[in-house]
Regions:
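Nucleic-acid endonuclease domains
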Residues: 1-115
């Protein structure tokens, strides 16, 4: 196990100095059907989490909600609860075409010592 951890970093991608962990979550519904949410594990030392959230139950990666979350905004949590109208969706949701340019902008900030 010691060697496994050493050879397999806790992030999925490295982009120009940024470490990125990619996550996916199905849409969870409460038994009463009134509440929907997603769950993500946030453990790790990555710079960002890119989360793909199932838009409708059963739709999987068909037009998912996408979140770009800098780890500085996550406090020592191991699980992140994301509601459909909560802070995480409102503050960190990005459109698919915005994801790559935003990551490149952050990589440039890192290169210039500003992040």
């Amino acid at each position: 196990n010691k060697y496994f951890k050493k050879n397999n970093p806790v992030y999925d991608f490295w982009l120009d100095g940024l470490t990125i962990d990619v996550k996916y979550s199905s849409l969870y519904k409460r038994k009463n059907g009134n509440s929907h949410h997603w769950q993500l594990r946030t453990k790790g030392n990555q710079d960002f989490i890119v989360a793909f959230l199932e838009r409708e139950s059963g739709s999987e990666l068909e037009e998912p909600n996408i979140l770009l979350i800098p780890m500085q905004f996550i406090e020592e949590q191991k699980e992140l609860h994301i509601s459909q109208s909560g802070r995480w969706i409102n503050d960190f949701q990005v459109e698919p075409e915005e994801l790559q340019p935003l990551l490149k902008d952050y990589a440039l900030l890192r290169k210039n010592g500003l992040f």
